[in-house]
Amino acid sequence: MPVKRSTLVKKLDKVFSQYIRLKDTDHAGYVSCFTCGVTKNWREVDAGHFQSRGKYATRWNEDNVKCQCKRCNGFRGGEQYQFALNLGTDLADELVYLSNQPARLTNDWLLEKIKHYQQEVKKLL
């Protein structure tokens, strides 16, 4: 029986989030919030999106997703203004443009990305 697309999306979300939270950690496993700068263990932060996860064209774009503390990402709605400032005008504008482009995701593409990020996470752990 073929795997459902929703299952693949959830699996990619999980491994991509791990990768984003791990890639900028220091030797002790701590990372700074992209928007407020507070330092936390990578397991205690979120993978915060500048452009919403609902926009598949940028959902798994590494430039669009950064480590954010739960306060900034959850309680403060992602701190979009500060997120944009920290990204810089050119990159923020590019991500807004990209997020409005159509995204045609195939199961093969999702499986390829899952495999890629699983390998990247394995290297970082």
Where does each model-flagged region fall?
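Histidine-centered nuclease catalytic patch
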Residues: 32-64
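Conserved aromatic-histidine-acidic binding/catalytic patches
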Residues: 4, 8, 57, 75
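Short metal-coordination and nucleic-acid-contact micro-motifs, chiefly zinc-binding Cys/His arrays
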Residues: 13, 23-32, 61-65
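Secondary-structure junction/capping motif
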Residues: 3-7, 33, 52, 69
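A boundary/linker detector
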Residues: 1-19, 24, 39, 96-125
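Short microdomains enriched in Cys/His and/or Lys/Arg
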Residues: 53-67, 88-100
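Short Cys/His-centered divalent metal-binding micro-motifs
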Residues: 37-41, 65-90
